[in-house]
């Protein structure tokens, strides 16, 4: 039974998921259906956390929209996600950046990671 579940879960995984983590700025291209029309909506923000594993893995992205914080949680391997672009690598020391919720302006900025 366990091998069967693992095989089904393996089919659900996407191959082209980029390497990203908390602190990175990403653009998530989401497929949205409005009535009979289908379009791509881009959600750009900072990754707060990445949790779970396999087909159930999710990540949370936070952005500021008209001075209001907007957070959205996406399944990594969702068929509704067209693609994920990493725009900026961030340098952080935590796996979960929940402390950013209480910060505004310059205090909410994350340093950019330097390439080695």
UniProtKB/Swiss-Prot annotation:
Q: Which cysteines are joined by disulfide bonds?
A: none
Q: One Gene Ontology cellular component annotation?
A: cytosolic large ribosomal subunit
Tell me which Gene Ontology terms the entry assigns under biological process: translation
Q: Which Pfam families does the entry mention?
A: Ribosomal_L19
Give GO terms: molecular function aspect only: structural constituent of ribosome
Keywords on this record?
A: Ribonucleoprotein, Ribosomal protein
Q: Does the keyword Ribosomal protein apply?
A: yes
**NCBIfam families the UniProt entry points to:** rplS_bact (TIGR01024)
The entry assigns this protein to a family as follows: Belongs to the bacterial ribosomal protein bL19 family.
Its annotated function is as follows:
This protein is located at the 30S-50S ribosomal subunit interface and may play a role in the structure and function of the aminoacyl-tRNA binding site.
Full protein name: Large ribosomal subunit protein bL19
The gene designation is rplS
